[in-house]
């Protein structure tokens, strides 16, 4: 009987820990009756499980009689140990720009005390595929790419960071004076952003799409293999040296969406969504990113 009680209490502890990860210090907690209903448990067993979490130092609750119970302190790492999240792995773009490095460094800093790792991979499609298959816990993509994936089932937009947090600006790159004569446009089929923006920009135009690697784009224009490519401009002086020019992309909100970083989780991974809400201070993350971009701080990820 005692062994059965311990097993049931463990299940209730896991459910309570998942709930508490979504709360913030100072919040009024649900009543014990409400929690018991959510845990599908008795009031007594739910109280015992809550006491266990308190005794372990995972939480501290202040009980105010008729005014309810309030969460005063919480240890995210301790709570994580009760929900089978021993570490977090995030699929992230290759860190080839300071903006990406700042994002990676800033996000990791938010998970202080929680084992947090990156799997750097090129192409949003593969990052999302690995997320859906359960290989990773979350994935960083642009809002533009995210909106296309969210039409599928199984994904949740868990964190939005605002414009120009993913890339600075995509532009149309072509040889000088030839922006009106584009017949062949380069396209990396692994890049959801580039595919969508190319379709938006050229619309129904009779333009041939040429498959290439994103990082070969500029050289392929210079060689004459393609006439243009939509590309994230990082260094203007590089364009000048190569004899190519950039034209800003305007007149469609999707171009701005491509500059915003978002974090996706699986739709049923409530602990990960709650964890992001609980530990990420968006203002601090973005300030960290900007310090890395400006050179005030070295990235650490």
Task: Walk through the language-model features, giving the residues of each.
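N-terminal "mature head" segments of proteins
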Residues: 1, 22-25, 41, 55, ...
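Extreme N-terminal segment that seeds HTH/winged-HTH DNA-binding domains in transcriptional regulators
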Residues: 1-31
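A short alpha-helical element within helix-turn-helix/winged-helix DNA-binding domains
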Residues: 27-39, 53
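Short coil turns linking two alpha-helices in DNA-binding domains
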Residues: 40-49
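Short, hydrophobic-biased segments on the C-terminal half of alpha helices
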Residues: 50-51, 128
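HTH-adjacent hinge/linker in prokaryotic transcriptional regulators
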Residues: 54-104
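Short alpha-helix C-terminal cap/hinge motif
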Residues: 98-119, 200-201
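C-terminal regulatory/effector modules of DNA-binding transcriptional regulators
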Residues: 122-125, 132-301
């Amino acid at each position: 009987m005692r062994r059965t009680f311990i097993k049931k209490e463990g299940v209730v502890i896991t459910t309570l820990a998942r709930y508490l990860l979504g709360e913030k210090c100072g919040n009024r907690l649900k009543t014990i009756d409400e929690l018991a209903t959510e845990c599908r448990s008795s009031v007594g067993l739910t109280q015992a499980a809550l006491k266990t979490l308190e005794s372990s130092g995972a939480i501290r609750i202040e009980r105010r009689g008729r005014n309810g119970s309030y969460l005063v302190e919480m240890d995210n790492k301790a709570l994580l140990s009760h929900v089978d999240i021993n570490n977090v792995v995030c699929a992230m773009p290759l860190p080839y720009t300071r903006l990406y490095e700042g994002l990676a460094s800033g996000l990791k800093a938010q998970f202080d005390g929680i084992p947090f790792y990156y799997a750097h991979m090129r192409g949003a499609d593969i990052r999302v595929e690995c997320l859906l298959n359960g290989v990773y816990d979350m994935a960083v993509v642009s809002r533009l790419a995210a909106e296309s994936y969210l039409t599928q089932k199984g994904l949740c937009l868990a964190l939005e960071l605002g414009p120009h947090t993913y890339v600075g600006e995509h532009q149309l790159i072509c040889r000088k004076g030839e922006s009106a004569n584009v017949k062949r446009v380069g396209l990396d089929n692994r890049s959801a952003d580039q595919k969508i923006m190319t379709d938006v920009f050229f619309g129904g135009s009779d333009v041939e799409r040429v498959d290439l690697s994103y990082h070969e784009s500029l050289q392929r224009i210079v060689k004459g293999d393609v006439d243009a490519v939509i590309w994230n401009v990082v260094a203007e002086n590089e364009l000048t040296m190569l004899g190519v020019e950039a034209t800003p992309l305007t007149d469609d909100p999707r171009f701005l969406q491509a500059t915003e970083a978002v974090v996706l989780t699986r739709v049923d991974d409530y602990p990960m969504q709650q964890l992001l809400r609980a530990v990420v201070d968006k203002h601090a993350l973005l300030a960290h990113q900007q310090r890395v971009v400006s050179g005030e701080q070295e990235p650490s990820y």
